[in-house]
A protein has these predicted regions:
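Non-catalytic, conserved peripheral segments adjacent to functional cores
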Residues: 1-94, 114-116, 122-136, 141-145
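Conserved metal-binding segment of the jelly-roll/cupin
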Residues: 94-115
């Protein structure tokens, strides 16, 4: 299966979540520090995690039905594999080149494109997960247009 790798934009990533970036409000002043809550969750308590990604292929995707999850690249290059909540076979792959937040229930996994990649993750403390295993590992390949 060949899946084209994309760079996330507000438009092409909207159905999976959002890109964490400044807004009109946070850019509204050249001299004052601005703060804006971009997303939240009804559940209590969040955890922050540091993920070192070394795998170059994915054996499965998982979802967190009741939790959003942020992926914030720190070092190296990795790819984010995602699929809609109700269509886990409809995979898309994005370069994780900016911080993003996944909606609740979006199927996902990450694989390294560089030798290893480091990612900061934030998600609900009591997160629950569901996993779907692929028949064969999915190994993204960069191709020319």
């Amino acid at each position: 299966m060949n899946i084209r790798i994309k760079y996330p934009t507000k438009t092409n990533f909207k159905k999976y979540g959002m890109i964490l970036e400044s807004t009109k409000k946070t850019r509204s002043s050249d001299s004052k520090t601005q703060y804006e809550v971009l997303t939240g969750s009804k559940s209590e308590g969040w955890l922050l995690a540091y993920l070192v990604v070394r795998n170059r292929s994915s054996k499965s995707i998982q979802q967190h039905p009741t939790s959003k999850e942020s992926f914030e690249p720190v070092k190296g290059v990795c790819l984010l594999i995602v699929a809609p909540v109700k269509a886990p076979k409809n995979l898309e792959i994005f370069v994780l080149d900016k911080p993003i937040v996944l909606h609740e229930g979006v199927w996902h996994d990450v694989v390294a494109l560089s030798e290893e990649a480091e990612v900061k993750i934030a998600e609900n403390m009591g997160v629950t997960s569901k996993t779907i295993y692929f028949k064969k590992p999915l190994t993204p390949v960069l191709t020319e247009k």
